[in-house]
């Protein structure tokens, strides 16, 4: 049986990357929340 997670960097960056987050209002909210929490990595 084929596993569900087949990693590829391009779609990963496109959907969860920093630039993708900055495109939307809610994405920016995610980044700010992670900054406030003190996350080492803000995005993928």
Curated annotation (Swiss-Prot):
Gene Ontology molecular function, alphabetical: structural constituent of ribosome
Biological process per Gene Ontology, one example term: translation
Record's GO cellular component terms: ribonucleoprotein complex; ribosome
Keyword Ribonucleoprotein: yes
Keywords: Ribonucleoprotein, Ribosomal protein
One Pfam family from the record: Ribosomal_L34
Domain of life: Bacteria
Alphabetical list of PROSITE patterns matching this protein: RIBOSOMAL_L34
Family: Belongs to the bacterial ribosomal protein bL34 family.
PANTHER family in the record: LARGE RIBOSOMAL SUBUNIT PROTEIN BL34M, MITOCHONDRIAL RIBOSOMAL PROTEIN 34 FAMILY MEMBER
Xref: NCBIfam families: rpmH_bact
Record's protein name: Large ribosomal subunit protein bL34
């Amino acid at each position: 049986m084929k596993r569900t997670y087949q990693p590829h960097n391009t779609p990963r960056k496109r959907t969860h990357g920093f630039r993708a987050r900055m495109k939307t209002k809610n994405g920016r909210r995610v980044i700010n929340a992670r900054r406030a929490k003190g996350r080492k990595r803000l995005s993928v």
